[in-house]
Structures are given as structure tokens and as C-alpha cells.
Amino acid sequence: GEGLRPRFILAYFLAAVLAIPAWLALSRRLGKHRTWCVAMMLAIVAFATVPLIPHGAFGAFFAVCVLTGAALGADLALPPSIQADVVDYDAWKQGEARAGFLFALWSMATKFAQALAVGIGLPLVAALGFDPAQVTAPGQFALTVIYAWFPIVFKVIAVALVWNFTLDERRLL
């Protein structure tokens, strides 16, 4: 399994890059916000299966890497485009350019979310019995559950917030 790690990582990022054109095409039909939500739902379904994958089922984990990587393609392409729409709308609504402020705010929120994930995830996995110095089956399962299901919680919240986001292409025009 350890020797396959580079292939899993390559599959993940290659799927992200290759999926971007498909996400962009879908966003022209569904809108950016809902397309991003569809991608997050794909990641949710893929991540939900991880604790159910038997030890050594590398093909199944490879499929998870490809699916979550494809979802990453939307994460890379759509939020910056949505941000640009927000900047344009804000400039029109406020009558002044505040792009620097808005991008700084977005960057700060992203860093806060990452810090929150680490600040909650690592103590939680330790509390559930994972010890990297002495890996046990229950500890390994706890790590797997946190790795897979912890992002699901935040993605479900994100989908709920983004699905009906009122600023879309029609409102900008």
C-alpha cells in the first residue's frame, strides 16, 4: 500500500485538472453555485464510503481518489469565479472598488476554516484513540472516520449555504 501512495496522489490531482472543463461546462447550464454544490455532493458520497473500504482494497480507494479529485476540480475553478462575481456586484452596489478587502476577507476565512479543521480534527482523532506511535485497529478506524466523515460535515453545511446563494449570473446582468 505505501508504494501506491504517489499513484493515489497523482490520480487525485490529475482527476482535478481533467475535470475542470466538465465543471465549467456544467456551470453554464446549472450556474456556478449549484455546480459547485454538485461537486461537493460527489465528494460527500465518495468520502462516505472510505471507512467501509476493506483494508487492502486499493482499487476502491483509487476510485475515491479519482472522484474526490474530480470534485476538487470544481473547488479550484468555481469559487474564484464566484468571488469575481461578488467583487463586481459589490463594486456596483457600493460605488467603490473593494476587491483587495474582499479577497483578504476570503483568504482570512479560508485560513480560519483550515485552522478550525486542524484544531478540531487532530484532538478529536486523538480522543478517539489514534496514536501514531502505536497504531491499533480502533485508532486506525478513528483516523479513517475523521479523515473521511469530518469533511462531510463541513461540505453539507457549505452546500446548504451555497445552493440558494442569490448572486448568480442572471442577477449580475
Say what each PLM segment does.
Residues 1-173:
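Membrane-embedded alpha-helical bundles of multi-pass transporters/translocases
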